[in-house]
Amino acid sequence: MLPLEGKLVLSIEQVIAAPFCTRQLADLGARVIKIERPEVGDLARGYDKRVDGIASHFVWVNRNKESLAIDLKDPDGLEFIKTILPKVDIFVQNLAFGASKRLGLDYENLKKYNPKIIVCDISGYGEGGNYGHKKAYDLLIQSESGLVSITGTQDECVKVPISIADISAGMYAYSGILQALLYLEKTGKGSRVEISMLECMAEWMNYPLYYTYKNATPPERKGAFHASITPYGPYKAKDGVVMFGLQNPREWESFCKIVLQDESLIEHEDFKNNTLRTKNASKVKEIIEDAFKNLSAKEVVDRLDEAKIANGNVNELNQVWEHPQLKARNRWREVDSEVGKIPALLPPATNNNYEARMDKIPALGEHTESILKEFGFSDKINLFKEKKII
């Protein structure tokens, strides 16, 4: 038995933040009904066709769900949704500002149908303030939160190439809902869980925020190198690049003895502690790459392993598909879809009592008629089709 079996989730969701949240609930056994616009569907369905004709974003965050394609702007479509609300345990939405309230699907209205309902509202900036009404996309939140300002090189700031603001919002929505379920169990009370993408990213930005406490100098943009730890990053060998990092004085001593084979550097005035090494990072890099210039990447890794220095490969994405550790730990499964079987990774949290659910990625509106029939609207299906509500 999965932890959330028996829970019904209704989600009006688009793209990443809400879909990632609800996919994780579905992984744990919740039944997730995904409400989509007829004919159009979730915007992410149209982002690309990289996975045998299905969009890569959509494949990632929509397994285990049922797709209900229904027009909520039509009174009959909205009435159907309100009919099933008494049976809904969790309601999730990441609509544009004010849309859920205009539809009568805000928390104050929803709790009239079910006082114990858990409602999760995801938005860019949260309610209120001068930003509450603004549109928000991942890039904008990365920028507003300061992440872009510290990412990149000295010459250019860059965005993180994955939708990290959306992902963080989805993660906090998921954990917030689990907290609300525990609160419901203890008190019998439902909850409204509000998630602001900006606040999610601000939480993740706490280290650089504190680093600049009282207007101190912000972390330097250093590409793949660490702003405040040296050595920590990619260093060139004879035939490639090796990524590694040091964390303490013991590792610096071991690194100098075994990897660089130069013990004079251990207590060198410019390098004897991390603050000095970071101040002189360009010198450290020059010394390291001079020592590595006649060594293959494998030889460098062998020395790092002998010195017990953490290191890793700079893998291309096609190498991640074949990563030996993912295979050794049997992390890959297959999920069904409208185009056949698609490989998918199990969720990262592994529980010894159960394996996460890994069911089909739905086609647009695949479950519309079965859901209408289940909730007593069999006689309305033809009418809804005529009116293009479904």
Description of each model-found segment:
Residues 170-190, 203-213, 256-263, 267:
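Oxidoreductase and adenylate-handling cofactor-binding alpha/beta cores
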Residues 127, 154-164, 185-201, 220-227, ...:
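Conserved Rossmann-fold dehydrogenase catalytic segment
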Residues 39, 125-126, 197-202, 239-241, ...:
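Glycine-rich beta-alpha junction loops
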